[in-house]
Design a protein with these regions (language model features):
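Active-site-adjacent substrate/metal-binding segments within catalytic domains
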Residues: 54-70, 78-82, 91, 109-198
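Intrinsic structural disorder
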Residues: 1-2, 79
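Extracellular interdomain linker/stem segments of modular secreted and single-pass surface proteins
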Residues: 103-109
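Ligand-binding face of N-terminal immunoglobulin V-set domains in extracellular IgSF glycoproteins
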Residues: 20-25, 30, 34-44, 55-102
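Conserved aromatic beta-strand anchor motif in extracellular beta-sandwich/beta-rich domains
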Residues: 47-49
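Short, compositionally biased P/S/T/A/G/V-rich stretches that sit at domain boundaries
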Residues: 2-15
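N-terminal start-of-chain detector that recognizes signal peptides
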Residues: 15-19, 150
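Intrinsically disordered, low-complexity boundary segments flanking structured domains
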Residues: 11-14, 44, 121-123
Length: 198
């Protein structure tokens, strides 16, 4: 399983180390007041590699005047970006641009060593972007993201966190995929009383 924090950057500068396949977050700040930015504005960023490859990612409103876009560069080298806002008068969001260099990943996570997953040429398997086979060994943890799952304690003496213990065990066992249900309906506890999901 792959776990790694995002690269959270309020702005990119030439000193920052952007690594291939790692998620990069760039923040933009609106200059104007928008009564309902979530529904009334759209913001996209087009990322262009020095080879000419172009990828467009939607940005998202993050409250107040903050907008963010996340991008994981699939190629090494120089990338530039330009934003396009549905309100061309919004100077803090429209036609913002910048550049950054992407370097090789130096960590141990296979996702960043070999790239995102894709369907193999014969359409029978999953493989990483560089062709490395991906072995899907997964577990579905139906209560993993609900109040039924204990984050701060555990009913198993081996683990301080019930949730953390399950993740640790699956990593130890070589699992590559973990899934959980976000919406499973109302479940009752042992006494028959309903408990909150969150």
């Amino acid at each position: 399983m792959y776990f790694d924090p995002l690269e959270l950057l309020p702005m990119i500068d030439s000193n920052h180390d952007v690594q291939r396949w790692r998620v990069l977050e760039i923040e933009f700040s609106a200059q104007l007041e928008h009564p309902d930015p979530y529904r009334n504005l759209e913001l996209d960023a087009t990322f262009t590699h020095e080879s000419g490859l172009k990828l467009t990612m939607p940005a998202f409103w993050d409250g107040k005047k903050s907008w963010k876009v996340r991008f994981a560069a699939p190629e090494l080298g120089l990338w530039t970006y330009t934003t396009h806002c549905s309100d061309a008068l919004e100077g803090g969001l429209h036609l913002q641009s910048g550049s950054f260099d992407v370097h090789a990943y130096r960590g141990a996570l296979p996702l960043y060593q070999h790239g995102f997953l894709k369907v193999s040429r014969n359409k029978r398997y999953l493989e990483h972007a560089d062709g490395t086979p991906f072995y899907w060994l997964g577990d579905t943890h139906w209560l993993g993201l609900t109040a039924k799952e204990r984050f701060d304690d555990s009913n198993d003496a081996r683990f301080a966190s019930q949730f953390g213990g399950i993740i640790e065990k699956r990593l130890e066992q070589g699992y590559s995929v973990w899934a959980a249900s976000l919406m499973i309906g109302e479940w009752n506890d042992a006494s028959g009383s309903p408990t909150p999901l969150w």
